[in-house]
Amino acid sequence: MKLTPREKDKLLIFTAALLAERRRARGLKLNYPETVAFITAALMEAARDGRTVAEVMHYGTTLLTRDDVMEGVPEMIPDIQVEATFPDGTKLVTVHHPIP
């Protein structure tokens, strides 16, 4: 199977997000890479599901709370930018302060 660098990146994000999801389900607090992967994958899937850019941006602020992540992680992530594939093409989505 031949994958482009972008496809490899998407698979890596998905794998890290799946690990983060499992750890969160066990009650563990997510670290920085897990948090970024979790939010990024959710944004990419929301775009693929057909939500608008505005809906995806808002959705990104509802995924995790400070109780879900390790101390200091929210301050390390002032924003997340994702090139997500929407039904009408690829667009850049920016979520400011993803962990309120």
From Swiss-Prot:
Its main location: cytoplasm. One of its GO terms (cellular component) is cytoplasm. Keywords: Cytoplasm, Hydrolase. It is found in: Cytoplasm. CDD domains: Urease_gamma (cd00390). It catalyses: urea + 2 H2O + H(+) = hydrogencarbonate + 2 NH4(+). Pathway: Nitrogen metabolism; urea degradation; CO(2) and NH(3) from urea (urease route): step 1/1. One of its GO terms (molecular function) is nickel cation binding. Pfam families: Urease_gamma. It is an enzyme of class 3 (hydrolase). Its EC number is 3.5.1.5. GO terms for biological process: urea catabolic process. PANTHER family: UREASE. Belongs to the urease gamma subunit family. Heterotrimer of UreA (gamma), UreB (beta) and UreC (alpha) subunits. Three heterotrimers associate to form the active enzyme. NCBIfam families: PRK13241.1, urease_gam. This is Urease subunit gamma. It comes from Burkholderia mallei (strain ATCC 23344). The gene is ureA.
